[in-house]
């Protein structure tokens, strides 16, 4: 039961990001800002599903080899999942940065002010896709090796604490770019927490 809570919270975090993001965008940029942010809300869950699929595909392999005590196979499977997710993150970021005009044009006419807001903001928003990949796969890893507490802590920090704090605080420092960079910063902070756990435990495959 405890292991499944992290999966539930990962899904709930998307809703939290959307609600908090809508509040911040309408506060700073009005209806045009919300319209621009809605584009990110359309494909952010799709990217999450890709990363989540990678993590879930690796979970049976990780769980089995963890159960039989084969630490080397656990490590190699985790690295393969991480490499696949990071590669996808690089591709998603590159596509968003290179084709931001085309992506926005699928949702908003070029004559609307929201178009320019979205074109400028999407590459900033996409800068966190690589860290997003590492975080989601890492949460799945912790679930697979029966480390429910780190998985739950990372999920709560990522999806609720860091996300809300960054969305509320970063725009005060960076104005409009800070709104778009809030989610990437939350992913980076989560990544740093994961690294801290890694160095504390030395080997993730040990309980």
What is each PLM-predicted segment?
Residues 32-33, 148-150, 175-176:
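Membrane-helix interface segments
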Residues 8, 15-42, 46, 64, ...:
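Helix-terminus/linker motif at the lipid-water interface of multi-pass membrane proteins
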Residues 3, 18, 22, 49-52, ...:
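Structural signal for membrane-spanning alpha-helices in multi-pass inner-membrane proteins
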Residues 52-55, 125-144, 150-162, 166, ...:
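Short runs within selected transmembrane alpha-helices of multi-pass transporters and secretion channels
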Residues 36-94, 98-100, 132-154:
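Small-residue-rich hydrophobic transmembrane alpha-helices
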Residues 7-19, 23, 52, 84-93, ...:
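Hydrophobic alpha-helical transmembrane segments in multi-pass membrane proteins
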Residues 1-5, 62-128, 169-207:
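Short alpha-helical transmembrane segments in multi-pass integral membrane proteins
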Residues 1-20, 46, 50, 122, ...:
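Hydrophobic faces of transmembrane alpha-helices in multi-pass small-molecule transporters and flippases
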């Amino acid at each position: 039961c405890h292991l499944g809570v992290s999966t539930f919270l990962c899904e709930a975090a998307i809703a939290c990001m959307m609600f908090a993001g809508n509040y911040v965008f309408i506060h700073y940029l009005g209806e045009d800002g919300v319209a621009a942010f809605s584009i990110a809300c359309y494909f952010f869950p799709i990217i999450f599903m890709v990363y989540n699929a990678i993590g879930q595909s690796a979970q049976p392999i990780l769980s089995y080899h963890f159960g039989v005590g084969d630490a080397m196979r656990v490590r190699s499977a985790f690295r393969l999942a991480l490499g696949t997710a990071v590669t996808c993150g690089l591709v998603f970021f590159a596509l968003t940065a290179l084709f931001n005009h085309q992506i926005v044009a699928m949702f908003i006419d070029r004559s609307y002010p929201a178009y320019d807001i979205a074109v400028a903001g999407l590459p900033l928003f996409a800068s966190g896709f690589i860290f997003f990949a590492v975080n989601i796969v890492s949460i799945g890893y912790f679930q697979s090796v029966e480390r429910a507490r780190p998985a739950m802590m990372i999920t709560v920090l990522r999806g609720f604490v860091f996300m809300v704090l960054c969305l509320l605080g970063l725009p005060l420092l960076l104005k409009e770019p800070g709104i778009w960079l809030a989610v990437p910063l939350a992913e980076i902070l989560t990544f740093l927490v994961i690294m801290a756990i890694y160095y504390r435990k030395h080997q993730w495959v040990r309980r």
